[in-house]
Amino acid sequence: MHPVRLFCWHFMAYPNLPEDFDDNHSSGWVTVPNKLWDREKSRGLYQTYIDQLAYGDELGFDGLVLNEHHQNIYGLMASPNLIASALTQKTEKAKIVVLADLPPLYLNPLRVAEEFAMLDNMSNGRLIAGFAVGGGPESFNYNVPSPHGRRRLWEAIDLVVRSWTDEGPFHHEGPCYPLRYVNIWPKPLQTPHPQVWVPGSRSIESMEEVAKRGYCYFLSSRSHGDGTKAAALEFAQVMEKHNKTYTPFNMGVLLSVYVSESDEQAKAEAEKPVWYFLRNCLKGHLRQKGKSMTFGPGVPSQSLRSWEAFLNAPRSSGRMLGDADSWDELEARNSIIVGSPETVREKLWGFVEQAQVGNLLIQFHFGNMEDKLARKSMRLFAEEVAPALRRDSGNLFDQEFPVLRDLELEEAV
């Protein structure tokens, strides 16, 4: 059987903001004053978050997901590779997914190649290597013109993968990274190299680049419905164009989930940290308020026409996750799934059955959620949601995608 792969994703949000943050600050990104960092309240915060992820390994999640952001309260992982390094020593089975490093921000992508190779060895071959261009905030923070980012990204990915697979030293004469000596030590443990994942937002250009290289496409969206199924169909068509066959494991999605003993208890426990996350952490990212700081012509790769349309659109249109006014609106768009094990299992199965995406990257911790609540949600999910989800999805995928059985036979030979 080939069941869904269930990953635990942690964003490591800053949980110690003043209650009036939304009233007094224009954004949680780029310009958010770092005087709000409370040293004493934040003592041990990284240890708590790392331990939550390590708990995911104990519970049997297939992987643990990290990502890179800069100068914000949404995610405190300026270097996800540091967190990944800690996890290599605290976990045994789960894949460690860095989704993603942002090589366009760096002078030399070989640093990413070397660190990923180290992590693959330190984890005994459990690394999944993610690469991304970065968003508008990163363009501002690192003063990297976003229109150049995509060219830098794909040259960097190709160079990193070649450094893992080709014998060195060799020279690389790329337009962005001309290098006389490419000869990394160590090589990754996995052969030919760790699996590569690349995020995208349904642009055909990104899908094309991912598909022709045979990588996994991660749909970078927090709203799910018909759009996710449409994206999967689009990617399948692009893969077919490149003589490849789509399976659910060629694509991944982000889901946000909270599980408790009943629907009522789940809402009561999750409501405060969820609104903290939406109102504060998404301000300037997935919320119209503050968005102009990190979204504009050329940021990220935004055309002037798209920017004008954004400015002229009525505020009721183009609503993002952080613009939600009510709990009913959140539930209607399937952005955050909150409920009893039965409710969560039913909703996730409906999503998997419709979208037929095999890598589910699940956020369990929101904003300022207490450690004990995040752990309870993870445990209930692992014990009372995951078994049926794996069983039913395995049957579905094997029936709908016979190529999976063929791949299994090839691996056994």
Regions found by a protein language model. Give the residues of each.
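Hydrophobic faces of well-ordered beta-strands that scaffold small-molecule active sites
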Residues: L6-H10, L64-L66, I96-A100, L127-F131, ...
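Conserved, mostly hydrophobic/aromatic
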Residues: G56, E68, L87, L119, ...
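Acidic (Asp/Glu)-rich catalytic clusters
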Residues: D57-E58, A84-K93, F116, D120-L127, ...
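A conserved active-site cap/scaffold subdomain adjacent to cofactor or substrate pockets
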Residues: R202-A232, A236
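Active-site mouth loops of central-metabolism enzymes
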Residues: V32-Q47, A100-L110, P192-R202, V257-S260, ...
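N-terminal beta1-alpha1-beta2 module of alpha/beta enzyme domains
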Residues: M1-K95, H193-P194, E400-L404, A412-V413
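Glycine-rich, proline-tolerant flexible connector loops at the mouths of alpha/beta enzymes
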Residues: V65-I83, L102-P103, R222-G225, I362-A374
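An alpha-helical appendage that flanks or caps ligand/catalytic pockets
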Residues: H2, C8-W37, R150-W185, D226-A355, ...
